[in-house]
Amino acid sequence: MAEDRKSFVIRENENGGVNITDEVVAIIAGLAATEVEGVSSLAGNLTNEVISKAGMNKLSKGVKIVTEEENHVAVRLCVNISYGYEIPKICAQVQDKVKNAIENMVGLEVTSIDIKIASVAVAGE
């Protein structure tokens, strides 16, 4: 059974339209978040962890996109932070980076970005 995915129309003209799914937006958010120094990785739920161990790693693990209204989304991230980094500062950088990536690449307006810190990663573990 195929997953029920939300899609967004990002361009429509006489030649046709361009639609993207919420999965694409989640991947963009996840990649942007992991580019921030101090973010060790994304943290997924149990289902994501099982999928990852089965060899079907998803780039959107730990990311949820919520449609607020047409072309407006909220982002929920679950991340692991590296030990020794200032968590509020890292989270502010993640919020800025994710918002800019989604708005510039896709054209959707990001209304909020909520971050849950799942764990602190210690070097060597």
Task: Place the predicted regions along the sequence by residue.
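Contiguous, often N-terminal, cationic amphipathic patches that form binding interfaces
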Residues: A2-I81, V110-D114, A118, A123-E125
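A generic structural motif
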Residues: I81-I87
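Short, non-transmembrane amphipathic alpha-helical segments
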Residues: I87-V106, V110
